[in-house]
Amino acid sequence: MSTKDVKELAIEQAKKFGGKLEVCPKVPIETKGDLGIAYTPGVAAVSSAIHEKKERAYELTTKKNTVAVISDGSAVLGLGNIGPEAAMPVMEGKAALFKRFAGVDSIPLVLDTQDTEEIIQTVKFLAPTFGGINLEDISAPRCFEIEQRLIDELDIPVFHDDQHGTAIVVLAALYNSLKLINKKIEDIHVVINGGGSAGLSITRKFLAAGVKHIIIVDRTGILSETDTGLPPHHAEIAKLTNREHRTGDLATALEGADVFVGVSAPGVLKPEWIQQMNEQPVIFAMANPVPEIFPDEALAAGAYIVGTGRSDFPNQINNVLAFPGIFRGALDARAKKITIEMQIAAAKGIAKLIPDNELTPTNIIPDPFQEGVAKVVAESVGNAVKETN
C-alpha cells in the first residue's frame, strides 16, 4: 500500500468514525434502579468513601487504569509545530494503542498553550483524574523541564514517550544485536546522531545499561565538554560522553565505531562512512519516513544489522513495543515514578521476547502484534518496582 493510499484511507476513516475513540459505561444503566446506583443517590456514598480516604479513588473510580495523553502540538512527528487541534488525531491514535495493546484507558488532551509554566500547572490541576501522565509531542528543550518538574511534583507516573519510548526499544535491539555480533556492551563504541530529546534519552539509557563509549553528533558536529558554548542540556550530557574528546563531523565520529543510532534527518549517513566502522557494524537509522540510510544501501556498504522506524523493513524500532506495557506495569504496581531501572527492565523484557535460537540479523526485535508483548513488558516493569522498593 502506497503512502498516498494510507493517507487517503486515514482521512476516510477519521471522517467515517468521527475520530478513533468513544466513552462507554462499564455498568448497566437500563432501569431507574440502575440509575440510582450509578448516579444519584448511590454515587454520593462512593464520593463520601473517597472523601474519607483519598486513596480509595484507585479502588472506586477509573483512576487506577486511566492515563492522560497530553500534548501542546509543538513537535508532532514529521509535521512540526502544528498546534493543539491538528495534534488531536495523533493523541487519539496513541490512546487507541494504549487500549489495544495493554488494556489501558486513556484520554487525549491537547493544550492551547506552549508556555512551560502554564503546561506544568495545567497538568498538575488535571492529575487527580488520572493514574499516569503520558506527555507527547512537546518540543525540546522545554520538554525536559516539563517532564522533570512533573515527575518531581506529582505522585503518579509521568513519562515523555518521545524521549523514552524509542530509547527503550533501541536498547532492546542493542541487547539482541550484541548477542549476534558477540561483543560486550562495555566494549562497544556507539555514535548517536541527533542531539534532540530522543537522542539524549537514548544516550542516558545506553549509559545506564553499561555502554561506556558514546559520541553524540548534533547539527553543529560532535558534542564535547570542551565546547563552552553548548546549551545546558547538551553541556550536561557532553560531560558523560566523548571520552576521547574528538572534534569534527559524523564521518570523524564513526571511525572505529560499532553502532550507529540515527534520530536525525534523511540521508545523512553515507555508505563510505559505514566502511570506516568496526567489523559487523550495527545501524539503527530511525529518521521517518526517510531514514538516515536505506537498509539496502547500508547492507551493501557492509552493515551486519540494520533497523529503522519503518514497518516495511525488517527490525522496526517501534515505541508501541514499550509504552503500553510500561504504563500497564506501572499502573498495576501503583508506582509513583517510571524510573531508569523500570525502563531498562522493559528493554530487557522486549529483547527476551525473541529466543536466542531465533535471533538473526533481520530478526532482532519482536513485532508489535506478537502475542504477549505488553504483558511481558508489564511484568518486567512490575518486577523492577518490587526490587527497588
Where are these regions (language model features)?
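N-terminal ligand-binding/catalytic initiation module
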Residues: 1-158, 384
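Solvent-exposed alpha-helices and their adjacent loops that cap or buttress functional pockets
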Residues: 15, 58-63, 99-100, 125-127, ...
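Glycine-rich phosphate/diphosphate-binding loop of Rossmann-like nucleotide-binding domains
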Residues: 77, 82-102, 160, 168-265
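General beta-strand structural signal in soluble alpha/beta enzymes
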Residues: 108, 134-137, 158-161, 192, ...
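Adenosine-phosphate binding glycine-rich loop
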Residues: 161-162, 285-389
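Rossmann-like adenosine-cofactor binding region
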Residues: 235-305, 310-312
